[in-house]
């Protein structure tokens, strides 16, 4: 979409939350808005900005109008370790979670000072629902605030603590005042739910996904979210060695805090499948340090040389999932990962950890019927993982993965066919003339009309 010359170019200001699952789709939304002719400014902190600077630099070089405003993060003032600006930079406990939310609330004043100086004047705020003070910014400047939700539920289960009650109340209050909501999904995926939600929100709901598909450039795919901890060449070299649909990709998200004993059980389950695998583990946490000791002592990587690849830290997930050799995805059912799996037509084995992930699992396994559940019923509580210990036995892990990867079974074939069909629908949705493309156009037109009314 290219805006007509006589139409004022709208200026959207985006406020992503300080967690990878929130930042990544918001950056994609920024690119989509700019591709439709809008001016976009993103407010974030220095270390979070560094994760997508190269992606944005390429976007700007291509002619997109995207600007970046960096807010100094008050780590020390909030009682956080120096340099901690994201949920994935630290072992999460309930106290740490409270401190991170508190730090975000402290950004209000500096953000307001910089927002007031923006030129051209902003016409709309798109804010993560976890940043309620953006509602006050919108009211001050008499512009709409559109809420961005990563999750299906309004408040993640892990946040239902008394000390976080004040934050939750502020979020709910801001939601009541929001002009509308932008969602990373496509209408055809969950049509009934979308239609009902539109009625609830007075039709101010815009489904613009799968937003990950805005990344056409290979480097944009490889560096989406962060620079990978493994070279794409090494990753592709491993994948190229294996037959189509023969490798299972295992990633339980950037906030996976499973007990070390459970991670060992996962390793054993993977090994017993005899199926080639890529396994992504968090780097630098206490849990993974214990896992690393076990991996070294037991010579796990040597035992699985050529068949298994462990990626420590950030992985180029889009590059991996879209490779022909990937035949299944063991996922925590975070919405971004779920939608990325759907986008490339890969069936899933589901291992939800907390929050909306249990709802997403039901969508994948019971509604869309493109996944197999590992049968997890226990919600992971941050800081209490060791008390839970082993929730899923290696036998269940092996069974679910083998079920998903089986190409001879009729049920597995049907699952794979459904996943492939949804992938094609998702790709069409974001292309010109598709439902998500049209929704992005309608959103921009809505803001332009509001802008015109305000000026007249």
Labelled PLM ranges:
Residues 1-247, 251-456:
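Glycosyltransferase specificity loop/lid
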């Amino acid at each position: 979409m290219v805006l007509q010359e006589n139409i004022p170019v709208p200026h959207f200001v985006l406020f992503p939350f300080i967690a990878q699952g929130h930042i990544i789709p918001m950056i994609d939304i920024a690119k989509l808005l700019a591709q439709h002719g809008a001016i976009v400014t993103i407010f974030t902190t220095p270390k979070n900005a560094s994760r997508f600077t190269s992606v944005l630099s390429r976007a700007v070089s291509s002619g997109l109008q995207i600007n970046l405003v960096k807010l100094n993060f008050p780590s020390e003032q909030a009682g956080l370790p120096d340099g901690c600006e994201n949920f994935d930079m630290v072992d999460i406990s309930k106290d740490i979670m409270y401190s991170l939310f508190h730090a975000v609330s402290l950004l209000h004043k500096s953000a307001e000072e910089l927002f007031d100086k923006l030129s051209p004047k902003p016409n709309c705020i798109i804010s993560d629902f976890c940043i309620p003070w953006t509602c006050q910014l919108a009211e001050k400047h008499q512009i709409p605030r559109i809420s961005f939700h990563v999750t299906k539920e309004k408040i993640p289960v892990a946040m239902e603590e008394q000390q976080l009650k004040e934050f939750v109340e502020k979020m709910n209050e801001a939601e009541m005042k929001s002009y509308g909501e932008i969602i990373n999904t496509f209408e055809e995926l969950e049509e009934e739910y979308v239609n009902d939600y539109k009625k609830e929100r007075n039709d101010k709901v815009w489904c613009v996904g799968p937003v990950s598909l805005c990344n056409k450039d290979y480097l944009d795919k490889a560096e989406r979210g962060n620079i990978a901890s493994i070279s794409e060449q090494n990753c592709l070299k491993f994948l190229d060695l294996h037959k189509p649909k023969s490798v299972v990709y295992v990633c339980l998200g950037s906030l996976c805090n499973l007990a070390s004993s459970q991670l060992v059980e996962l390793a054993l389950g993977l090994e017993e499948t005899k199926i080639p695998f890529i396994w992504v583990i968090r780097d630098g946490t206490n849990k993974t340090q214990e896992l690393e000791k076990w991996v070294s002592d037991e010579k796990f990587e040597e035992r699985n040389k050529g068949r298994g690849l462990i990626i420590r830290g950030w992985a180029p997930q889009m590059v991996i999932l879209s490779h022909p050799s990937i035949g299944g995805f063991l996922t925590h059912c975070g919405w971004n990962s779920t939608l990325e799996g759907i986008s490339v037509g890969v069936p899933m084995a589901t291992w939800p950890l907390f929050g909306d992930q249990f709802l997403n699992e039901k969508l994948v396994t019971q509604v869309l019927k493109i996944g197999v559940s590992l049968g997890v019923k226990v919600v992971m509580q941050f800081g209490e993982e060791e008390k839970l210990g082993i929730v899923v036995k290696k036998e269940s892990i092996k069974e679910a993965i083998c079920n998903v990867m089986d190409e001879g079974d009729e049920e597995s074939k049907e699952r794979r066919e459904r996943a492939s069909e949804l992938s094609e629908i998702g790709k069409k949705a974001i292309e010109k003339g598709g439902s998500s493309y049209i929704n992005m156009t309608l959103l921009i037109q809505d803001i332009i009309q509001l802008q015109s009314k305000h000026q007249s």
